[in-house]
Design a protein with these regions (language model features):
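Short, mixed-charge aromatic SLiMs
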Residues: 43-51, 174-183, 241-251
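Helix-rich, typically C-terminal accessory recognition domains appended to large enzymatic cores
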Residues: 205-255
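Catalytic adenosine-cofactor/nucleotide-binding cores of aminoacyl-tRNA synthetases and other
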Residues: 75-201
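Short, histidine-centered active-site or binding-site loop motifs used for metal coordination
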Residues: 3-7, 150-154, 224
Length: 256
């Protein structure tokens, strides 16, 4: 599966996070995803910031089935065969700005089989790409808390307003992340058991439902507080779900 990702607010990273989550889910279903950015900007900084937020950085080169000139020619002749399975772009961003080839807007729309439009921040443009890594990570001292903050919102939902988009719930995200990591570390000491199919399936279903990460996180919160589920089962379920979330929830195992 080929995914073309472009900047989508919060200094590029929100769009790449969406592509990352889509890739993680695709791998779970047996696909082999490749995320690329054909128009990289500030590549070194982007890769560093992606690493901080546990986002697989996009590739910046790809051998396409045809050259840019051939693409333009094909679309000029009315051929509409998508090159990419999914395109990720900022809400309102013209599709032609996502590709380094001289094709018009209708043709560019047809290059991806499906487009995901990612909302930006309430106090800036959706396609803002100029935030520094430090500005991005002011949302939380823990980069994973920034990731969690973003996942609490649907990708089409505009983040909060003010000088620090999303700051309204960054503190609660830090606290919840710390709590979950401590719980996972404590659960790891209990006898292991098969993961809860009920909660695991609910998380997977939420991802399948238009990448509804907010609903998936609510399922995990419910599992954490479910007294009827043994601790060892909670551990296995959280560990499996974290392959989708990418929050490093098992980081503190062995510390408690």
């Amino acid at each position: 599966m080929l995914v073309a990702a472009r900047s989508a607010g919060l200094g590029q990273l929100r769009g790449y996070l969406v592509a990352d989550l889509l890739s993680r889910y695709s791998e779970r279903t047996g696909l082999t995803p490749t995320v690329i950015d054909l128009l990289p900007r500030r590549e070194a900084e982007l890769r560093a910031a992606c690493a901080e937020l546990n986002i697989y950085p996009p590739r910046h080169t790809l051998t396409l089935p045809v050259t840019g000139e051939q693409l333009a020619g094909q679309f000029a002749d009315g051929i509409r065969e998508p090159v990419f399975d999914v395109g990720v772009r900022a809400a309102g961003e013209p599709a032609e700005l996502c590709f380094p080839v001289g094709i018009d807007q209708p043709a560019a729309e047809g290059l991806a089989g499906h487009w995901i439009e990612v909302a930006g921040a309430g106090n800036g443009t959706a396609g803002d790409t100029e935030a520094t890594s430090g500005e991005r990570l002011e949302l939380g001292a823990e980069p994973a808390a920034v990731r969690l903050t973003l996942m609490r919102h649907g990708y089409g939902e505009t983040l909060g307003s003010g000088p620090q988009p999303g700051a309204m719930d960054a503190d609660s995200a830090r606290k919840e992340l710390a709590r979950w990591r401590e719980l996972v570390a404590r659960w790891a000491r209990s006898p292991s058991g098969p993961m809860s199919r009920r909660y695991a399936d609910a998380v997977t279903a939420a991802f399948a439902d238009d990448l509804d990460t907010a609903a998936a996180l609510r399922e995990m919160a419910a599992l954490a507080d479910d007294a009827g589920v043994p601790d060892g089962v909670k551990f296995e379920t959280f560990a499996a779900a974290d392959r989708l979330f990418g929050l490093d929830l098992a980081r503190d195992v062995g510390r408690y």
